[in-house]
């Protein structure tokens, strides 16, 4: 009888989130000159109303490790900030309830700090791939990555805003992946679930609704080639199953 009981306890331990250390979440958000101010305000609203409240609900049963990092024209070397909630096993319930509120306030304050710094530096371009590469290097374990950006990589690697790319052709997308491998190296997204929200069709003829399905295919293929999985893609974080 002892063997089945031991196996059951081991199974239980492995499935209790707080016994496996913090759950890792990373939020990468387009800031500085990578997105207009009103768009950044929209991302902040998404964080305040659609993302952070859902993450905060986990705090009473799970230790959460949240990394916030900007997507800019120099995403790979951009500073990141880490917030970690208390271990629920060793923290009184009333303190965990307080931690839920503190966590959300600190995350928004951190967003504002990162935005201020990114605006001051104002590096042109939108390096989503560089941000994903940095996120992969920060990851300590299986985790979840939320990208808040319009979806258009604009860097030395490529300009997805260019409708002449013919991105709907698989061979074109594969050629871009080969360029990423050669110049930067693919991100290491093994065991990472990625969700991209904030997607837009753009404001002019270069970025129209016909282009966006091809851009989704590109990101899906890049993330898969990097060992990760694209689990959500759309205009709002509500498409992300891990929230």
Positions of PLM-derived features:
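Hydrophobic alpha-helical targeting segments used for export or membrane insertion
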Residues: 6-18
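P/S/T/G-enriched low-complexity
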Residues: 23-29, 190-192, 196-243
């Amino acid at each position: 009888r002892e063997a089945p009981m031991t196996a059951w306890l081991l199974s239980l331990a492995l499935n209790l989130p707080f016994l496996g250390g913090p759950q890792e979440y990373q939020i990468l958000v387009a800031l500085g000159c990578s997105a207009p101010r009103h768009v950044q305000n929209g991302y902040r609203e998404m964080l305040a109303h659609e993302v952070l409240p859902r993450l905060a609900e986990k705090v009473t049963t799970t230790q959460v490790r949240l990394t916030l990092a900007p997507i800019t024209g120099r995403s790979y070397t951009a500073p990141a900030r880490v917030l970690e909630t208390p271990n629920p096993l060793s923290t009184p319930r009333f303190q965990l309830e307080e931690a839920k509120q503190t966590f959300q306030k600190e995350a928004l304050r951190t967003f504002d700090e990162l935005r201020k710094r990114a605006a001051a530096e104002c590096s042109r371009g939108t390096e989503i791939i560089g941000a994903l590469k940095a996120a992969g290097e920060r990851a300590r374990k299986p985790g979840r990555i939320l990208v808040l950006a319009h979806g258009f990589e604009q860097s030395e690697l490529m300009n997805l805003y260019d409708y002449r790319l013919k991105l709907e052709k698989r061979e074109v997308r594969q050629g871009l992946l080969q360029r990423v491998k050669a110049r930067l190296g693919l991100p290491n997204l093994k065991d990472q679930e990625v969700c991209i929200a904030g997607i837009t069709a753009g404001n002019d003829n270069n970025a129209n609704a016909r282009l966006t399905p091809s851009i989704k295919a590109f990101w899906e293929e890049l993330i898969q080639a990097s060992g990760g999985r694209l689990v959500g893609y759309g205009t709002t974080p509500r498409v992300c199953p891990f929230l």
